[in-house]
């Protein structure tokens, strides 16, 4: 076992304060064409299942601003098959983020029922959306803009995907992922988004960008006429703020946790460089020989989608898996490869030893090993001696403490995570 030091990545960030978040969310609503909806009309506000910083505050502000403007907003879960593909499950997902009728001051209408609003123009795919949203006088979706974990394109994870996949509920999500195997997601999302924009009174979306520390960097109102072009520009900004591992070639990486509240892929493929989605290519970097993942976040509620990216997992993670929840999610997305169960180990010591012994001929002095809390919290990392030495030569890295032996108790790693375990 190599000794491990602590390094930090030097990121310059300027997150919004709580007051600024509320002000930016209200201003974002003001940038939407509300006049397209008759005064007193209903506006369906789509909210997803991702763990987004300040989500409850942003949603509450959007709802309050619409109400003060003379409209009757209601919230609907726009999260595809998440929450076990049930209305009750999706309502519970929102509640875990503090989004309840009492807290938001408006109704939450949750249903898995959909209605067809059109067909694809180049591929004859049915375009379906949430029934309640389709019956509203206007639709507005709220989502974070970020690189997707399974494909690259002009728009990836954001407003367009929420309209197509999230608002499509399980049926729409299943159709989208099925057709994506032969018709790439990068082409399908814009095409189906245009069908939805033509069929419904979508007044736009509230786009959120987060910085490398997982904090709110910007909130922007995007009108429907600019939805695809503006989202593409915002995606460029999101790429620049995407946290990454600071080395391109690594022997072993330990992640203390994975989960759906961290990334749709459990472990963000933009960080791991691993992508097992049929028809899509993996990122060019980093190259990681072995990945060990220790536990599943409580916020995942057993959904271990993406566990197949790891080479070794702790038995605690395996025992925390809800197989049915995981299977529903991955059958809907079509990415069954991500449900493959890695080697399981009863102790951290056994798991780390398995990774080291299968990563090539290495010594404690030469092995390139990192330990991170998860793929979203990458500011502070444990690093082996070889990587600590490399960090001293770089202006973007700082060595916080020199390597010391890893501490185990009965085989369990007792050194705390680089940053606090747990997620919103």
Language-model region placement:
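N-terminal amphipathic/basic leader segments beginning at the initiator methionine
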Residues: 1-24
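Short glycine-rich or small-residue beta-strand-to-loop segments that form or flank ligand, phosphate
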Residues: 42-51, 74-81
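Glycine-rich phosphate/diphosphate-binding loops that line cofactor/substrate pockets in enzymes
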Residues: 28-44, 67-68, 246-247
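An acidic, phosphate/nucleotide-engaging active-site surface
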Residues: 89-154
């Amino acid at each position: 076992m190599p000794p491990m030091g602590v390094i930090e990545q030097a990121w310059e960030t300027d997150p919004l304060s709580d007051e600024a978040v509320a002000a930016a969310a209200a201003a974002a609503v003001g940038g939407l064409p509300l006049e397209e909806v008759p005064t007193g009309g209903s506006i369906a506000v789509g909210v997803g299942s991702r763990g987004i910083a300040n989500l409850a505050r942003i949603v509450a502000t959007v709802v309050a601003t619409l109400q003060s403007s003379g409209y009757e907003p209601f919230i609907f879960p726009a999260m595809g098959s998440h929450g076990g593909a049930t209305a009750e499950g999706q309502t519970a997902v929102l509640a875990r983020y503090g989004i309840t009728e009492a807290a938001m001051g408006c109704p939450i209408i949750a249903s898995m029922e959909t209605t067809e609003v059109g067909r694809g123009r180049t591929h004859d795919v049915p375009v379906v959306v949430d029934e309640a949203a389709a019956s509203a006088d206007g639709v507005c979706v709220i989502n974070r803009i970020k690189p997707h974990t399974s494909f690259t394109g002009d728009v990836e994870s954001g407003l367009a995907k929420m309209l197509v996949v999230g608002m499509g509920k399980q049926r729409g999500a299943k159709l989208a992922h099925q057709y994506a195997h032969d018709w790439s997601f990068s082409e399908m999302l814009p095409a189906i988004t245009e069908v939805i924009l033509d069929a419904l009174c979508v007044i736009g979306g509230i786009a959120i960008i987060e910085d490398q520390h997982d904090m709110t960097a910007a909130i922007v109102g995007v009108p429907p006429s600019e939805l695809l072009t503006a989202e593409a520009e915002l995606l460029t900004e999101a790429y620049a703020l995407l946290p990454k591992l600071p080395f391109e070639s690594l022997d072993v990486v330990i992640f203390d946790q994975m989960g759906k509240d961290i990334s749709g892929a459990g472990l963000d493929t933009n960080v791991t460089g691993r992508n097992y989605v049929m028809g899509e290519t993996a990122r060019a970097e980093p190259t990681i020989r072995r990945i060990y993942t220790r536990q599943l976040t409580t916020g995942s509620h057993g959904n271990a989608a993406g566990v197949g990216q790891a080479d070794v997992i702790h038995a605690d993670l395996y025992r925390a898996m809800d197989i049915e929840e995981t299977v529903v999610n991955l059958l809907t997305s079509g990415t069954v490869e991500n449900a493959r169960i890695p080697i399981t180990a009863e102790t951290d010591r056994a798991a780390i030893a398995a990774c080291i012994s299968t990563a090539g001929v290495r010594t404690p002095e030469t092995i390139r090993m990192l330990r991170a809390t998860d793929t979203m919290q990458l500011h502070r990392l444990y690093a082996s001696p070889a990587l600590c030495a490399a960090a001293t030569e770089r202006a973007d890295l700082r060595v916080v403490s020199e390597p010391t032996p890893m501490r185990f108790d009965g085989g369990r790693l007792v050194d705390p995570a680089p940053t606090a375990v747990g997620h919103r």
